[in-house]
Design a protein with these regions (language model features):
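Extended hydrophobic-aromatic, low-complexity segments
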Residues: 219-222, 235-237, 246-248, 267-276, ...
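Active-site phosphate/pyrophosphate-binding segments
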Residues: 2, 6-45, 134-136, 141-258, ...
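Glycine-rich phosphate-binding loops that contact phosphosugars or nucleotide phosphates
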Residues: 27-28, 36-185, 213, 254-255, ...
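Short basic/hydrophobic patches in alpha-helices and adjacent helix-turn junctions
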Residues: 229, 281-285, 330
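Generic C-terminus detector
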Residues: 303, 312-347
Length: 347
């Protein structure tokens, strides 16, 4: 078993431990959160780099659905260009596996000491953990170059934080997390059955686009990063709506299009999900090959490979989607003669 495969296989157990911790009383102190900002509810700014940033999309989408202002900002861009955005009602949530990336250290040096800050971090002795008003541990275990456990753990921690900010009971989130963990276990157990046909369908594309909407954009962005890091393939994440405004012009049989389509919890979201299925059909019609991860019915069509996924609420679909993509990129790397999870240039 490769090191990356071992990391992938550990995710259900790690998330189970995380669930137990964050359902314990006082894991996220509501009174402590309230004292960090002048006005409540706050304007929540999630920031991170790479998978740490992408992990925030479900929490941001959830808070927005509750009428709470929330943004996701890349840390490097935030510290260089948007520092003056912060005000007395801003709650800054910094997500970082190490807690000591160059961008995070620069942000810590630039912020006023009175800025209310929550750290979601895997290294509890890091500079970020020491500076934050509240530390929420990722509990992802030993760090690895490719974000597997750290990504899925960050998604779950941020959702528990979002529920606490919205002052909602955590039970529905915990139920959804347990469901996602069970789905992960099934996918990993069926790896040898599910992934090889997908590898054959995927073949060797010269361009990959990953498309979705809302909270599931996390799957598109994290998936694109995994394609770059593991099998060293060029991949572009994008909003499915944005794809129709120009990028459709480069649809090509040599390209692969990955669409994440999950049933929404509101009428508006369900309409968007139907749009994702229509997009899959349109890409196929124009000659593209589509890998469709969906919990919605879709016709069995040539050049579309449907991977049914378990429906899961509370924006946690990415916990399932990402395991599918992790296994796919792992096997694509092996097929290309690469060591899965080994970096050539980045540290």
């Amino acid at each position: 078993m490769t090191t990356l495969m071992a990391e992938i296989a550990e995710q259900p157990a790690v998330l189970s431990g995380l669930r137990k911790f964050y359902t314990s009383p006082g894991a996220i102190p509501s009174k402590g959160l309230r004292t960090m900002v002048r006005d409540w509810p706050p304007t929540v700014v999630f920031t991170g780099m790479g998978s740490s940033m992408y992990a925030a999309y479900p929490a941001q989408a959830y808070l927005a659905s509750q009428g709470i202002r929330a943004l996701v900002w890349e840390t490097g861009d935030l510290v260089d260009h948007h520092r003056k955005f912060f005000g007395p009602d801003t709650l800054l949530v910094v997500v970082s596996q190490s807690g000591e990336t160059a961008e995070v250290l620069r942000l810590l040096g630039a912020l006023p000491t009175k800025e209310g800050m929550v750290a979601v971090c895997n290294m509890e002795t890091s500079a970020l953990a020491r500076r934050a008003n509240l530390l929420l541990p990722m509990m992802a275990g030993r760090p690895a170059p490719v974000g597997t456990k750290t990504y899925t753990c960050a998604v779950a921690v941020l959702m528990y934080l979002a529920v606490a900010i919205a002052r909602k009971p955590p039970h529905p989130l915990t139920q959804s997390l347990m469901h996602a963990i069970e789905a992960q276990e099934k996918i990993i157990d069926r790896h040898d059955e599910l992934t090889p046909p997908t590898v054959e369908f995927f073949d060797k594309p010269n361009y990959i686009a990953l498309l979705s909407r809302g909270a599931d954009l996390a799957s598109a962005y994290q998936g694109a990063l995994l394609f770059k890091e593991v099998p060293k393939m060029g991949a572009e994440p994008m909003s499915a709506a944005q794809f129709r405004h120009g990028p459709m012009e480069i649809i090509n049989p040599a390209h692969r299009y990955i669409i994440f389509a999950r049933k929404g919890e509101s009428k508006l979201k369900r309409e968007a999900d139907n749009g994702l299925l229509r997009l899959a059909g349109d890409i196929r019609k124009h000659g593209g090959r589509v890998l469709l991860y969906a919990d919605l019915p879709f016709a069995d069509l040539t050049n579309v490979r449907l991977i049914p996924v378990e429906p899961v609420r509370m924006g946690l679909g990415t916990l399932i989607d990402s395991v599918h993509i992790q296994l796919l990129v792992h096997d694509l790397a092996l097929r290309a003669g690469l060591e899965p999870g080994s970096f050539r240039f980045a540290g």
